[in-house]
Swiss-Prot record:
Residue ranges for the DNA-binding region feature of this UniProt entry: 288-307
Gene that encodes the chain: rpoS
Family from the record: Belongs to the sigma-70 factor family. RpoS subfamily.
Region (Sigma-70 factor domain-4): 262-315
Keyword Repressor: no
Protein name: RNA polymerase sigma factor RpoS
Taxonomy of the source species: Bacteria, Pseudomonadati, Pseudomonadota, Gammaproteobacteria, Enterobacterales
Organism: Salmonella typhimurium (strain LT2 / SGSC1412 / ATCC 700720)
Length: 330
């Protein structure tokens, strides 16, 4: 028997055939395997139901926290002092009175990979941390201090979900060629090569090389860990000015005044480099190369001063019970 011959026992003994010998399939059985309009409608209703439950839970939570009265400046100091001495009721009062602040901040981070309730939950952790760390004798309003910690915990949660900066693959490949050549030249020349030296090595226009190196620097400058015990990058903590509304004016003014005060505890060179690099004190954020050109220093020297300035700034903030993330963000 050839391999193409159909064996009788290969047939379904219960199969029905039409008059042409073609097996007649059970159309009812087939239709049951495909989703009907009713099935799709049911799935849509289930999805809508799940969404509605999330909305209901959110509204319920917002309704509950709406009954917590805000504290006056005097009440903040009173309850903060008692909380520092271990009074649980005062600690709870400070947390409950600022839950709406968490919601306001969390709403700014919508469509960033986490649901609103998840953002609120993360922000509440930051609020609790702020209550534990807050010292009313330092002159801050608690809302300003808490905002830093709330934003930091939310940003960290979002960071764990996704990175923000993406480059087209052809740009990445071209950039890698320039960076590899720069590394090779730095070993050969015993100094960091200039854009002109890289361009000559690759036989490329200097402007093209400079543009790509500036692109890389803008990315890495905000995507490089700040150092110390922090693995967080400036990308994850720099404020988005579009987030600020009129209601943020008071706490933003407090924050700016604090930043200016701390920057002026650095030496003049460190202060100018950090201000120019990160867009502070009225400067536009600039690359190491651009800053060096403006103040008459090499790119490498500017980088060294930046590292020294951030290290000194971290020390200053630690004496205030803060960290460098709290300064640059949120």
């Amino acid at each position: 028997m050839s391999q193409n011959t159909l064996k009788v026992h290969d047939l379904n003994e219960d199969a029905e055939f039409d008059e042409n010998g073609v097996e007649a399939f059970d159309e009812k059985a087939l239709s049951e395997e495909e989703p009907s309009d009713n099935d799709l409608a049911e799935e849509e209703l289930l999805s809508q139901g799940a969404t509605q439950r999330v909305l209901d839970a959110t509204q319920l939570y917002l309704g509950e926290i709406g009954y917590s009265p805000l504290l006056t400046a005097e009440e903040e100091v009173y309850f903060a002092r008692r909380a520092l001495r271990g009074d649980v009721a005062s600690r709870r009062r400070m947390i409950e009175s600022n839950l709406r602040l968490v919601v306001k901040i969390a709403r700014r981070y919508g469509n960033r990979g986490l649901a609103l309730l998840d953002l609120i939950e993360e922000g509440n952790l930051g609020l609790i941390r702020a209550v534990e760390k807050f010292d009313p004798e330092r002159g801050f309003r608690f809302s300003t201090y808490a905002t830093w910690w709330i934003r930091q915990t939310i940003e960290r949660a979002i960071m764990n979900q996704t990175r923000t900066i993406r480059l087209p693959i052809h740009i990445v490949k071209e950039l890698n060629v320039y960076l590899r050549t720069a590394r090779e030249l730095s070993h050969k020349l015993d100094h960091e090569p200039s854009a002109e030296e890289i361009a000559e090595q690759l036989d490329k226009p200097v402007d093209d090389v400079s543009r790509m190196l500036r692109l890389n620097e803008r990315i890495t400058s905000v995507d490089t860990p700040l150092g110390g015990d922090s693995e967080k990058a400036l990308l994850d903590i720099l404020a988005d000015e579009k987030e600020n509304g009129p209601e943020d004016t008071t706490q933003d003014d407090d924050m700016k005044q604090s930043i200016v005060k701390w920057l002026f505890e650095l030496n003049a060179k460190q202060r100018e480099v950090l201000a120019r690099r990160f867009g502070l004190l009225g400067y536009e954020a600039a690359t190491l190369e651009d800053v060096g050109r403006e103040i008459g220093l090499t790119r490498e020297r500017v980088r060294q001063i930046q590292v020294e300035g951030l290290r000194r700034l971290r020390e200053i903030l630690q004496t205030q019970g803060l960290n460098i993330e709290a300064l640059f963000r949120e």
